[in-house]
């Protein structure tokens, strides 16, 4: 079996310096790992992504892809965990557009990375704890971490109509989409819209609202009232069970866990169906595509989808019963995989195309304008083709996506005294979702043996999704380092968490190896003395 090391492995902070982060364009067969070692991608590999298994043609310039038989793994890893040591997620800078750090010398000290990354997870914690609801920013400490309205640059009060915006622009956009909106600019349609002059031209203000991504359908699911209504729809059985437990002095966590265990697989699948986030719209870049315009559209889309992903995770039964830190760490570990498996599901009925959004559909060759992304497009198309061959059903997809979230981290989540309880809760959740997937497959009417084979085939593809996710993360970090595209707030937090996690993994790995070497040296000295 051929051994192939990833060209962009993460071994130290210096590997993300701009001078070293260029991902080469490869035109040979693309490899899929059969095992992962930490965050360095040292794995044995086998040919998987080649034109022989793709449902689209490859241009003649890549004819060297056609050689070699397709070999499948005999023992692929299923739901392989991410690297162990996850470290703190970054918080925001004071601008809505957060640009990458300036270039640094590759000879910089390894410890300097810890000074470039903030040490808390304020945005993700705020959203998970339910404070993503529109609320004004009042305290001086809160203003340091505030979002800014992309229309007028005032402080944003919340997430309105698909973007972070201030109360003034939110109200203006609401009036415009509900009533009179045939505004006319008295000048040249290029008026400056800022905090002081936002009322000077309604036409240019509305145009800028649309340019930054405000959409009519992007409001209802973010509103507090929506969540209140959803909570009021709880079944009478659950309310009765909770009230009875309180009268008897029972513990709420145990009762909520009991409620989860009483959910049938069918009810759990229906809950996952209701939790599905809405489609996110993003404007297609103008032709011809450039590296900057393509990456700008993709990062804007990812940032919007991350907001919806948090709401989706909180609606999975039992997820909010985990500690806030555990919720943060699980999302940090799997966000790219969740985005990519969602992309594959949207693209499953469109061979040769990637449906990033309803208004952003890309062909394989359209990725040529972005250095290093063509390889990722090929891997996405190949894995989507495999899901298409399996005739992946929507309910199966819902269960698989939830399993990616719940199985995304195998290292100790909570503190030492809470580790056993946290692990038990997470295992209980994962078992419930796995049972739901088994139930969905059994409902298809195939034989027991075919059910087992189908379950194995679906789970085996998750290691491919993990591999593509790692490649996508490395590519995005490279684009950020080269200042090709600005990286937005929540997306920046996730990227910084990934970078710091890989840095600490490499440091801990080197420390372990040095300790082991010293122990071996001591042992050899003792043997010689004897």
Curated annotation (Swiss-Prot):
Q: In which tissues is it expressed?
A: Expressed in the CA1 region of the hippocampus, expression decreases with age (at protein level). Expressed in prostate, ovary, lung, liver, kidney, fat, bone, brain, uterus and testis.
Q: Where is the composition biased (Low complexity)?
A: 506-515
Q: Which residues bind DNA?
A: 149-214
Its post-translational modification remark reads: Phosphorylation at Ser-87 and Ser-105 recruits NCOA1.
- Start and end residues of each NR C4-type zinc finger? 149-169, 185-209
A Pfam family of the record is: ERbeta_N
Q: What is this protein called?
A: Estrogen receptor beta
